[in-house]
A protein has these predicted regions:
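C-terminal substrate-binding/active-site "lid" region of AdoMet-derived donor-dependent transferases
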Residues: 150-218
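Conserved class I S-adenosyl-L-methionine
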Residues: 57-67
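Long, low-complexity, Ser/Pro/Thr- and acidic-rich intrinsically disordered regulatory regions
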Residues: 209-317, 327
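Conserved SAM-binding loop of SAM-dependent methyltransferases across substrates and taxa
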Residues: 70-81
Length: 327
């Protein structure tokens, strides 16, 4: 297979995500991470992981800071990993990612896709949480993180978590000098490749590493799932992929999105919320064509357009939140 050969179901998923959130990346909502990886670049990474790290149906994949959920959905479809898990600490980006997963599940259910594709999507779980709560990365075989913009304090913590794990592979965007010498990850480089990003239009090099040693978890109370070590933070999600069916997963996602929308702005009145939805930012207003009578038309935003609007207007506030969390 050519390194950039992309499966039809993967192309369809990216098309649906584009309809929901456009080309803008994770930073478009205001985070400190600039851009979201393109479909072609992610496919290159997937093919390299297949070739060099045995990524396949038996693999378990985690995306630390999953943002809009593209890598998670991608590997759930190709190669159809056993468990695709994403964790995001920013509630707004998590909601965007959940909406992206929801529309892919909508398509799978509504269009009557094959049971195999439904099963692949059913293995994808996104959670709102803090990765620093984990003691290790078990049961994941592949740890992926778009760590451009991660503060040193967080990378030091992730090094401790990874070194206590049995996870075999680490995929990230920092070179050997930083990851091994500065942050102390017990890894060695396998391969690296250039990638392109949406939003920022920047290119970044992704580095694929393998573990060189495994430290014993002498001071950690391990729990197991399916006979494998599993950190408590990931246990329930993994069980959910084993026991839940597609319909129950789909309904659960819809309920989580609804609850998150209701609780993310607890102090906003219905009138204020209506005003926010109806009025775009000044930069957007300038792009709206005026009617013949000279008055601007400010159309009511749909759910999809509201999500895009959220991405555009909270840049400054979200960067302040990020700095506060990781000084």
């Amino acid at each position: 297979m050519n390194i950039t050969t992309i499966l039809p179901q993967t192309r369809k998923a990216y098309s649906l995500i584009h309809q929901m959130t456009g080309d803008l990346g994770g930073n478009s909502h205001g985070g400190a991470i600039y851009g979201e990886i393109t479909m072609v670049s992610m496919q290159k990474i997937v093919q390299l992981m297949k070739r060099h790290t045995k990524l396949g149906p038996g693999s378990r994949f985690i995306d630390v800071g999953c943002g809009l959920s593209k890598p998670n959905i991608h590997v759930a479809l190709d190669p159809g990993v056993e468990f695709s898990y994403g964790i995001e600490m920013d509630v707004n980006r998590w909601i965007l990612g959940m909406n992206n997963l929801k529309i892919c599940l909508d398509e799978a259910i509504g269009k009557g896709q094959s049971k195999q594709n439904e099963q692949f999507l059913h293995r994808c779980i996104l959670e709102h949480g803090n990765i620093e709560s984990a003691k290790n990365f078990d049961p994941f075989t592949h740890v992926y993180m778009f760590d451009v913009g991660f503060p040193p304090k967080l990378l030091n913590k992730l090094s401790e978590i990874y070194n206590r794990s049995q996870s075999k592979y680490l995929i990230c965007y920092h070179g050997e000098k930083d990851m091994i010498e500065k942050y102390g990850f017990d890894i060695e480089l396998i391969v690296k490749v250039k990638t392109n990003m949406h939003g920022s239009r920047r290119s970044h090099t992704v580095f694929i590493y393998r573990r060189v040693s495994t430290k014993k978890n002498e001071n950690i109370d391990l729990i197991t799932c399916n006979g494998m070590p599993c950190d408590d933070l990931f246990h329930d999600a993994w069980i959910k992929t084993k026991k839940g069916d597609l319909q129950s997963i789909h309904e659960g996602i819809k309920q989580q999105i609804m609850i998150a929308r209701q609780t993310s702005e607890p102090k906003r009145t219905n009138l204020q919320y209506k005003d926010l939805v109806q009025k775009p930012s000044l930069s957007l207003r300038s792009k709206i064509k005026k009617k013949k009578n000279g008055k601007s038309s400010l159309p009511l935003l749909t759910t999809k357009r509201h999500l895009q609007f959220i991405q555009k207007v909270l840049v400054t506030s979200q960067m302040l939140i990020f700095v506060h969390c990781y000084p």
